[in-house]
């Protein structure tokens, strides 16, 4: 603060919780970063009227008094982007929690603490690309790589605004993130750039164009991959009441999805949930294609913003997370961002809106809730990145929503459903029956089915038909359940009894998945397809056999559903035990066993038909 001029200071006029009003702030900009009070608390200007500025403070404001100084920094709230992001744990405004703990020696974050986001002293191994002195470069060009860890190479890019002719490029060697690695001349002026760049969190990073997303986001959860798929570069919402398993699904996506990396934002969640994530993730490993085990933290960045942290920082944490994701997207990677949960973010907006005395809309939320949600979700997508070499990257956003009492007509849920393309609705009743993941297959939907058809055709040409049959069976079973409750199961036609039997296989043995077992915590797509094919094959063959033997055999005996269950009991047990196939045995082994079961089903039903026709 000593270097600041007197004209850079305003003075506090009023304090109301996280909102501070300051005078003498003429010349300030919207969303400018300020330092409030003697403790230099971080704040951001959110309203300007004349020379009065309204500031939201990202730290605890108790102890601030009228007349305290407010220092303008003349820059927006920004995040530092460079090597060292992966494997790190930040708070909502990108302060590194581990570094703060080391500096302060305390379990709580001290007020006004000023620790650099990325390690300034660590030496990174820089490998320059093919550029030479005299070459012309522009924003987004990859000027070198840094092997950040064994999973990801960090591509060092020029900042988007840069352009000119190279006058110096650093040779291969070890540098910290603030050392000059390239110098560019443009119109007679020289500019120096290092590995680190800053970017304002509220501004989307520039791209050449948005592209159509056509690759599925495989999560390892059968119900999501087969019935309600998301895409890389898509938007998904997971609304559900407390205890439905939102956090488990979010964490499963972080652990097993086919993204290159994950940014997990715990926005206003319980402290012990975030602690569990922080304890679990460093111990988790993922198996690479070449068989080696790697720590999952090597591809993960955590933004931890628990419910007892200042409310204003919740709003910033979402923007921090999406800016980090966009940075890796610009390198040409496919990143996924988990926001758990956007409801807490909306509650932070509501609280600050109330402090500003804005006109409340539905349930007290501000009228601009929908616009803020849309501007956040619209930063997802598959894009052609700026700079050379030409490359594509994507950011997928998965937002958990916690509607009070599981009421999906809540304003946050309604606004979210108007924006996102995939809806994974969690059902309290399924969760109470211990059916997890508790995704309700009757209300959930995905608008990406048509976009993904070419992928499915290539992977397995009859998967689309199999999935359609499975969905019809589940829909029909819901209608039949009402009849069964009125008149009992015995009054149903034989073909309807088969529908109920197939639906049981689908619900109990296919859609339900145990995240805490070795064989079922992650289900590869080939296993999902094989399992669904066998269940649908049973349905088709059983229905066909009953229709063909409707007249009975020479003794007048007809093939009934209970006879099928009695005669093929062992085979049906095999169908229900498919989930126990362990993916670690290898794709060819698992696929071979599932195909054998399919052949056995056809053979046994052929024999049954011969017996009863």
From Swiss-Prot:
A GO molecular-function term, please?
ATP hydrolysis activity
Q: Known InterPro entries for this protein?
A: ATP-synt_VA_C, ATP-synth_a_Xtn, ATP_synth_asu-like_sf, ATPase_a/bsu_AS, ATPase_F1/V1/A1_a/bsu_N, ATPase_F1/V1/A1_a/bsu_N_sf, ATPase_F1/V1/A1_a/bsu_nucl-bd, ATPase_F1/V1_b/a_C
What processes in GO biological process is this protein linked to?
Answer: ATP metabolic process
Gene Ontology cellular-component annotations: plant-type vacuole; proton-transporting V-type ATPase, V1 domain
Q: Which UniProt keywords apply?
A: ATP-binding, Hydrogen ion transport, Ion transport, Nucleotide-binding, Translocase, Transport
EC number(s) per entry: 7.1.2.2
> Between which residues do disulfide bridges form?
none
Write down the chemical reaction(s) this protein catalyses: ATP + H2O + 4 H(+)(in) = ADP + phosphate + 5 H(+)(out)
One Pfam family name is: ATP-synt_ab_Xtn
Which residues make up the binding site for ATP? 240-247
What family is this? Belongs to the ATPase alpha/beta chains family.
HAMAP family, alphabetized: ATP_synth_A_arch
Function per UniProt: Catalytic subunit of the peripheral V1 complex of vacuolar ATPase. V-ATPase vacuolar ATPase is responsible for acidifying a variety of intracellular compartments in eukaryotic cells.
UniProt subunit comment? V-ATPase is a heteromultimeric enzyme composed of a peripheral catalytic V1 complex (main components: subunits A, B, C, D, E, and F) attached to an integral membrane V0 proton pore complex (main component: the proteolipid protein).
What is the name attached to this protein's record? V-type proton ATPase catalytic subunit A isoform 2
